[in-house]
Amino acid sequence: MLDKLSNHIGRQLQQARQRKGLTQAEVAKRAGTNTNYYAKLERGEAVPSLKMLEKIVKALGVKSSDVLPF
């Protein structure tokens, strides 16, 4: 289940980032994290905390409901 969640979140983050025309480094900087961690999120290798997810969706200019499957 966690793999499914992390993969879903990763795909949604990547799509949102690409729609905005941003690089992973730009999103990571805006969210206050490092590029390697953000890249892991997009690949589905990590699940962000709610606090980090809040920062990332703000950096992307989307809502958390756009990223989460529920």
Question: Which residues fall in each region the model found?
Answer:
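DNA major-groove recognition helix of helix-turn-helix/homeodomain DNA-binding modules
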Residues: 51-66
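A detector for short, charged/polar N-terminal pre-domain segments
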Residues: 1-8
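Charged/polar positions on well-ordered alpha helices
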Residues: 18-19, 30-33, 50, 66
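Short basic helix-loop element that most often maps to the first helix and adjoining turn
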Residues: 11-29, 55
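Short alpha-helical DNA-recognition segment
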Residues: 21-43
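Phosphate-coordinating loops and pocket residues in cytosolic domains that bind phosphorylated ligands
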Residues: 40, 69-70
